[in-house]
Curated annotation (Swiss-Prot):
Function: Catalyzes the reduction of the glycolytic intermediate dihydroxyacetone phosphate (DHAP) to sn-glycerol 3-phosphate (G3P), the key precursor for phospholipid synthesis.
Organism: Sodalis glossinidius (strain morsitans)
Catalytic residues of the enzyme: 194 (proton acceptor)
InterPro entries (UniProt xref): 6-PGluconate_DH-like_C_sf, 6PGD_dom2, G3P_DH_NAD-dep, G3P_DH_NAD-dep_C, G3P_DH_NAD-dep_N, NAD(P)-bd_dom_sf
Name under which the protein is recorded: Glycerol-3-phosphate dehydrogenase [NAD(P)+]
Superkingdom of the organism of origin: Bacteria
One GO-annotated biological process of the protein: carbohydrate metabolic process
Length: 338
């Protein structure tokens, strides 16, 4: 029946499932939809996501739904958790079935494929200017979130009421803290750039450069993120919060990060195709590198780390040589651009 769920979650991968579990654990009725009906039926049969979160049973209030129109009729609030390169096409698929009072939030991290646009711009183009929008971003590994381990995240929304409602739905005093932030540009950008820097951190560790180099790369990566954000109109403080520094440190230092593992294998000399096969899931940073570098060019921002990672990924530059290129750059003031 329409109106019988607090939230619809679109995307039954690891992160979408973890967020659905979190919402249901908070006592809310949640519907989880995925594009593959057979996968949804399998999840319903065993009441857990065996592929990604095998040790976390679904709460009773988490329901599975294979029909998109049925799912979207059940609630005004829709949480999208899909890879960034299909974000626009998923919105287009949802649009005819959305309720008139629909509100859209996404936890997708990245930029639109090819154009490099923020996902907010994509949502506005597809859905129009009136629908409330919000984005969740921050240091959240799906396994830890689903297990109920303490986690904090940032939430940015176009509408204050929507922001407050989302905080109420998601916030759990025992394990999940949600910080509101009005800076949609910064919150979205942080989630994209950190993917790129995490690949760089993995490459550095794969080569064997050590903790000093990793920390320097994270710090200078944060500087690149902040410079691009300033040029795009983001608030500087956002990049010192959950969606900036928080997510950057997490993704660069823990091997639960696909982006970091991707870089780690490249740094160890594993071939590109073998790396992709080993990871087995979408590595957002691979596409994001091209898109972030295009954004930097558009706004006239120097991003040397991003540029070298791009050359490794797309121009077959040797990873060790890319690192030496960065180390050999001209001396400059730490506070200066580049």
């Amino acid at each position: 029946m329409p109106g019988d769920a607090s939230m619809i979650v679109i995307g039954a991968g690891s992160y979408g499932t973890a967020l659905a579990i979190t919402l249901a654990r908070n006592g809310h009725e949640v519907l989880l939809w995925g594009h593959d009906p057979a996968h949804i039926q399998a999840l319903e049969a065993v009441r857990c996501n065996q592929a990604f979160l095998p040790d976390v049973p679904f709460p009773p209030t988490l329901r599975l739904e294979a029909s998109l129109p049925t799912a979207l009729a059940a609630s005004r609030d829709v949480l999208i958790v899909v890879p960034s390169h299909v974000f626009g096409s998923v919105l287009t698929e949802l649009k005819p079935h959305l309720r008139q009072d629909a509100r859209i939030v996404w936890a997708t991290k990245g930029l639109e494929a090819e154009t490099g646009r923020l996902l907010q711009e994509v949502a506005r183009e597809v859905l129009g200017d009136q629908i409330p929008l919000a984005v969740l971003s921050g240091p959240t590994f799906a396994r830890e979130l689903a297990a109920g381990l303490p986690t904090a995240i940032a939430l940015a929304a176009t509408d204050a009421t929507f922001s407050a409602d989302l905080q109420r739905l998601l916030h759990c005093g025992k394990s999940f803290r949600v910080y509101s932030n009005p800076d949609l540009i910064g919150v979205q950008l942080g989630g994209a750039v950190k993917n790129v820097i995490a690949i760089g951190a993995g490459i550095s560790d794969g080569i064997g450069f050590g903790a000093n180099a990793r920390t320097a790369l994270i710090t200078r990566g944060l500087a690149e993120m902040s410079r691009l954000g300033a040029a795009m109109g983001a608030e500087p403080g956002t990049f010192m919060g959950m969606a900036g520094l928080g997510d950057l440190v997490l993704t660069c230092t823990d091997n639960q990060s696909r982006n970091r593992r991707f870089g780690l294998l490249l740094g160890q000399g594993v071939g590109f195709e073998a790396v992709q096969e080993t990871i087995g899931q979408v590595v957002e940073g691979y596409r994001n590198t091209k898109e972030v570098l295009a954004l930097a060019g558009r706004y006239g921002v120097e991003m040397p780390i991003t540029e070298q990672i791009y050359q490794v990924l797309y121009q077959n530059k040797n990873a060790h040589q890319a690192a030496l290129t960065l180390l050999g750059r001209a001396q400059k003031d730490e506070r200066a651009g580049g």
